[in-house]
Amino acid sequence: MPKHYRPAGKKKEGNAAKYITRTKAVKYLQISLATFRKLCILKGVFPRDPKKKVEGNHKTYYHMKDIAFLAHDPLIEKFREIKVHRKKVKKAFAKKNKDLADRLLNRPPTYKLDRLILERYPTFVDALRDLDDCLTMVHLFAALPAVEGERVQVQRIHNCRRLSHEWQAYISRTHSLRKTFISVKGIYYQAEVQGQKITWLTPHALQQVLTDDVDFNVMLTFLEFYETLLGFINFKLYHSINVNYPPVLDPRLEALASELYALCRYMSSGRVPGNSEPAGLIEDKEGEDNKESSKTDESELRLAQLQHQLPTNEPGALMHLVQESTAADADDADAKECRSLFKNLKFYLSREVPRESLLFIIPAFGGTVSWEGEGAPFDETDEDITHQIVDRPTQSHVFLSREYVQPQWIYDCVNARIILPTEGYIVGRVPPPHLSPFVDNDAEGYIPEYAETIKRLQAAAQSQVLPLPSLGDEDMENSLVEAIIDRSESNEIADKKRKLEMLEKQYHDELRMEYEGKTFSNRTADNQPDVVDKSDTKEADDHMEDSHKQAEKDAADISKTLMSRKQRGLLQAIEINQERKKDKVNLLKKRKKNADSSASAKGR
């Protein structure tokens, strides 16, 4: 049969059928551009970059399947209801119908994003992998001032602050913090939760100024989704360590802006996972049981009022979050090392140091901390304090039983995983350079001087070699014998290699002498010692080195000719990257040399 005839231009194929421009997508969904942006942010739909742009390079393209996916979402209808509601409120105010306007304002249409969390993250690990930007955004808004003109409301700021402190309380309680770094942008943290490395940035505790070149509508849309995501993750993490969520804060500490320590009120609620009501609110039929329950409530309330005064160096007493159960955090190597870094150390924070950051870091590594102000667990006159964190040129009053260090010492100890010497961090002295733990010095090709010092300190701290617990005495003897045998074999291999090098050198010397006209028979007949002029030997070595380099270059050129264009481009990019690293290393070495020379000149 003849093929069915189809007029040209009636059916789209290829990229024209797969992708659609943003303008056409907005018309297809019958929504405004602002609503389209909000819908794409909440649903996780992002623009695409097709190889062949049918409508032109200046257009923004989306996948047609994504737009069809958005068309069936119930959020579109909710956004339309919100738009209609705003029109009704505006019309009621225009007609001066205050009662109708108040009724409309008290009953606005709402929507929830719980369904979107389940759609975008099928498993909990997927949600943890996408938590970096979420934590950075939430911590940013927790430090911003509330501005009604930009729709940054006070309630939203307080919610961000609550979520961030709940996250920090979990990380600190489970000792999951691994790295931290102070930069110009803020303070970087990296934690490991259920095998996933999560990195986020918190701003410095300074007065923030909102600029006019930032679109807060887009940021608030992201924040709306991130608040729901972080609340869901906190809920799952708290229940994973047998803690009910959300925690109940101590009003006294909350009023003193100590929300992180206000979580100690949590255990006073009498809730356990699985119970829907507090233990003190269960009503009994008999009067005697009612009296006993009222006495229990009074004792629990009294304990709740005094609970913040308990010593914070007890296991789990940092936030008083975890019930007495053996299902605590996993005892892996990193957790053990982090838990015992600041063990048996007591810190006191002066008022000029970054208090919230240090209150988060020090307990996460097993230390006990207090601060200057109301609601603190202990005051400055406590004789058990081992370190006082000070960031001022001089210290007026000094306790001889403690050390006064700068805040950088805490961060450097955390990154090095050892207690560093405090001589370089004392009050009034310029501290050592603050090295980033996120940079691999070996891969970069340049190791700073202080990094080498820290490596030597780490090696000294780990110098004690202990037998493995799974090996007995006989196994230890066998392992020692095997090590001695391996050592002897390696020595034999080194001797053979040395002899081969000597023979090869002798062979090259004979070739060079033969090239110059001298023979081996003449040398032996004259009974002259086998001595070669140093200058001739150097020239021969240079010639051999040049020949080796030329051979390597020829082999590299031959291998390049056998590569495809893509492989050659990749190799060229790698070589360019290596050259850039070398130039950067040379620049750093030059700067260090100039700095050392200038410092020595000043010392004179």
UniProtKB/Swiss-Prot annotation:
SMART domains tied to this protein: BRCT (SM00292)
A GO BP entry: maturation of LSU-rRNA from tricistronic rRNA transcript (SSU-rRNA, 5.8S rRNA, LSU-rRNA)
Compartment(s) where it occurs, according to its Swiss-Prot or TrEMBL record: Nucleus, Nucleolus; Nucleus, Nucleoplasm
Region described as Disordered: spans on this chain: 275-299, 518-557, 574-604
The organism's place on the tree of life at top rank: Eukaryota
Compositionally biased intervals (Basic and acidic residues): 282-299, 531-557, 577-586
Keyword terms: Nucleus, Ribosome biogenesis, rRNA processing
One annotated Gene Ontology cellular component of this protein: nucleoplasm
GO MF annotation terms: mRNA binding; ribonucleoprotein complex binding; RNA binding
Cross-referenced CDD domains: BRCT_pescadillo_like
Pfam families named among the record's database cross-references: BRCT_2 (PF16589), Pescadillo_N (PF06732)
Domain BRCT: 337-427
Entry-linked InterPro entries: BRCT_dom, BRCT_dom_sf, PES
Family: Belongs to the pescadillo family.
HAMAP family: Pescadillo
Job description of the protein: Required for maturation of ribosomal RNAs and formation of the large ribosomal subunit.
Protein name: Pescadillo homolog
Species of the source: Oryza sativa subsp. japonica (Rice)
Gene that specifies this protein: PES
